């Protein structure tokens, strides 16, 4: 799911901004990078922490506090299944009045729910067109 989302984001010309580590983040980065997209990793520590698909590494040394940078740097947030770091990104995005699309992630009031990556991209495009994101 994450890799497909990355591919679709790249195909639509979007830049992927994420935490730049492994797991779901790496899968999304892989999909975007292998499809010619721009991938920015906002890293908790040093550049060496980045997964191999991150094209632009931003070493913050800020651990979880970097989530504020990730969200502030984004036009919208697509949340995939994750833990409390994902939850904090959702909360920050809602507080900053950014569109949040939940793709199998936390079910929180104010977020849009997508059943698959294609629907997430459709919702993102609609939010961007309407100036909500």
PLM region spans:
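Helix-adjacent hinge/juxtasegments
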Residues: 30-72
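C-terminal binding/interaction regions
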Residues: 63-132
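Glycine-rich beta-alpha loop segments
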Residues: 1-40
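Short, well-ordered alpha-helix to beta-strand connector turns
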Residues: 13, 54-55, 74, 97
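Conserved SAM-binding loop
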Residues: 17, 59, 113
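Short, ordered loop/turn segments at secondary-structure junctions
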Residues: 21-22, 44-47, 105-108
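A generic local structural motif
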Residues: 2-4, 25-27, 44-45, 64-66, ...
